[in-house]
Amino acid sequence: MNIGILAVDSNYPNLALMKISSYHKAIGDNVEWYNPLCSYDKVYIAKVFSFTPDYGYYINADQVEKGGTGYGIKKVLLPEIDRMIPDYDLYNVDKNLAYGFLTRGCPNRCKWCVVPAKEGNITPYMDIAEVSAGRKNVILMDNNVLASEYGLQQIEKIISMGVRVDFNQGLDARLVTDDIARLLAKVKWIKRIRFGCDTPGQIAECERATALIDKYGYCLLYTSPSPRDRTR
């Protein structure tokens, strides 16, 4: 089969599309980015946001399958696709970088967020060893990993494995206790720790969490040829 992939509203690596690509390549299909000058047996279209314009042109394919929050919250990947290692070549992702989730869902019910309606309460999803698949840098897109005991166990495993991570959706600063701060200070972060700050009322919580983590020795160290130029 000739498979086309179309991301409507984002250039950011789309995990679902990468897994779909892996699945079809594994069964011998040809997979490529959709080209309107070509014809396809099937085209997968992904849309992240409900407020962005849809693809408005004719799709030259026998079958068209649309997915993503931009089209609705009910459709999910088939289990045999969901557990595939993503096809990182689709986006020319660095060979040492992986993307994924450790948990899905969130216990909060923020009025602006679709996650609870789409994924429900927080549940275990994948192990960091599965997600990283031997890669040393991992972008984790969990919505509230600190709200899960499983998530905290996974952070401990991240530390023991020595992988570098970025929870790019932000951590919930309100959940940072003394013990969690000590744990987070041991993680090898890609550039920085991110905290979600969706309302002005959360600024104080972010400052409190930052101070706690700083207490346990988390710092950024810029190394230059001269020891005198090293700064925190």
Q: Predicted segment positions?
A:
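Core AdoMet radical
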Residues: 5-6, 44-48, 114-209, 220-224
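Acidic/glycine-enriched edge-of-secondary-structure segments
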Residues: 7-29, 109-113, 166-169, 194-200
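N-terminal pre-triad scaffold of radical SAM enzymes
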Residues: 3-13, 86-120, 135-142
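A short, structured N-terminal alpha-helical element that caps or precedes a catalytic domain
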Residues: 1-66, 71-73
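Single conserved hydrophobic/aromatic residue that forms the stacking wall/gate
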Residues: 222-232
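Short, charged, surface-exposed secondary-structure boundary motifs
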Residues: 43, 55, 73-79, 111, ...
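Ser/Thr/Gly-rich flexible loops in soluble cytosolic domains mediating phosphotransfer, phosphorylation
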Residues: 64-88
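Surface-exposed amphipathic alpha-helices with a cationic face
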Residues: 57-60, 114, 210-217
